[in-house]
Amino acid sequence: SRIAKEFQDSDQRHYHVPCPFCGVKQKFEWGGKDLDYGLSWDKGAGGIHLPETAFYKCKFCKERIEERYKTEMMLAGEWIAANQAHRHRGYHLPSFYSPVGWLSWSQIVDEFLKAIEDGNRTLLKRWVTTRKAEPYREGVTVVDHGKIYARRANYGVTVPVRGQIVVAG
C-alpha cells in the first residue's frame, strides 16, 4: 500500500511504553503463536479461547500486564525512531494503544478470533489493517528463479518439414 511504502521511507517511529514491572520500554506488539511476549489471552478447558482474559506479556521480564496498567504506561511512553537516517517522520500506532474505555484488548482479541474462526478473509484483512495497522499480505508463494532456470530444456533448432513459421517466447 502507499501508506506502508511511505512509512518504510521514513524514520519509522513507534510508541514505546515502560513495563510496570521491569521498567524497560517496548512497543506494543501482537503476540502471535510463535512469540512468548505481546498481546495474548488464555485458553480454557479443551483449548477454548478466552478473549476476555486478554493481557500483554512483557518482552523482557515476561510478566503478565493487565490492561488496567495501560494508562500509566501510555503517560510515560515516548516515540522512538527505528530508522534515524531518514529526515521524514513516520508514525505507527496500532489499536493496541487505544485508551482504556475505548477499544479494549479483549475486543481486539475477540475480533481476531472471529475473523479466524469464520475463515472470512475480508474480516481478517480489515482486522490486520485497522487493528495491527499493517498492510495485509495474501499468502504468496515466492518463486526460486534458480530452480526454474535449472529445469530449462534445450530444444534443437530443426524446423519441422511442413513448418512455415517459428514462434518463440
PLM regions and their residue ranges:
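Short, flexible loop motifs at catalytic/binding sites
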Residues: 1-147, 152-169
